[in-house]
């Protein structure tokens, strides 16, 4: 029995190591040549496995890109974003969420450019992975807009729908990269700029604190 469990553990470790090599190969390939199409044969060769192994591990080309995008976002700081969303104050949720999103994009900038660029050329695999990430992001924007409204933070002339649209634009990779790459701002400066834009556009003025 002990021998069987040991063999099962070795097989599991071997499977995880294979999965890791394939994901690492894809990430490295995207960083090296972000504008060139990705071939499964090339990824298999880089990972030192057969092409069929890639499909056995991930099910499909789309499954491979889904797994990579999920891992990249997790590794880059998704936990910080989750923490921001859980903050009881909607305004702090807004600030922390934008800050965490910017840090994720900054950490992933090279690969993110490749993924977003390739999504239009490869809509079924790369595009599908990005679409699913963006759908989750949109859900987050709607949730934040509702929270701001429920806590009386939205300006009277801004609807929940309008707030969600504005947040969607400001929290996008395109907005981040326009400031980070286009203007040469640091990640902290980008986060501060986007947060200021969001609060000035959407939120009521905060009453200054007064001494009791």
Task: List the model feature ranges, each with a label.
Residues 149-197, 205-212:
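Hydrophobic/aromatic-rich alpha-helical bundle segments in the mid-to-C-terminal region
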Residues 67, 80-107, 164:
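Hydrophobic alpha-helical connector segments
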Residues 58, 68-69:
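DNA major-groove recognition helix of helix-turn-helix
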Residues 1-48, 56-57, 62-63:
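Basic, helix-initiating cap at the start of DNA-binding domains
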Residues 58, 117-122:
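Short helix-capping/turn signature of helix-turn-helix
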Residues 103-114, 125-151, 161-165, 192, ...:
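Amphipathic alpha-helical packing segments from all-alpha helical-bundle domains
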Residues 52:
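Key DNA-contact positions within bacterial/archaeal DNA-binding proteins
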Residues 40, 69-77:
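Short, basic, alpha-helical segments at the C-terminal edge of helix-turn-helix-like DNA-binding modules
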């Amino acid at each position: 029995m002990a021998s069987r469990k040991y063999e099962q553990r070795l097989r599991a470790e071997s499977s995880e190591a294979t999965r890791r090599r394939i994901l690492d190969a894809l990430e490295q390939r995207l960083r090296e040549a972000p504008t060139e199409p990705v071939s499964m044969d090339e990824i298999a060769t880089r990972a030192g496995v057969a092409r069929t192994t890639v499909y056995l591990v991930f099910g499909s080309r789309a499954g491979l890109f889904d797994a990579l995008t999920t891992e990249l976002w997790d590794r880059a700081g998704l936990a910080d974003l989750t923490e921001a969303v859980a903050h009881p104050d909607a305004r702090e949720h807004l600030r922390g969420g934008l800050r965490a999103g910017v840090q994720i994009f900054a950490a992933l900038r090279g690969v993110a450019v490749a993924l977003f660029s390739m999504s239009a050329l490869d809509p079924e695999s790369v595009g599908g992975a990005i679409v699913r990430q963006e759908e989750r992001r949109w859900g987050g924007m709607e949730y934040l807009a509702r929270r701001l409204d429920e806590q009386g933070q939205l300006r009277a002339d801004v609807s929940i729908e309008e707030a969600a649209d504005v947040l969607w634009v400001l929290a996008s990779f395109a907005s981040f990269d326009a400031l980070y790459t286009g203007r040469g701002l640091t990640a902290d400066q980008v986060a501060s700029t986007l947060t200021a834009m969001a609060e000035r556009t959407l939120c009521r003025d905060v009453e200054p604190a007064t001494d009791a």
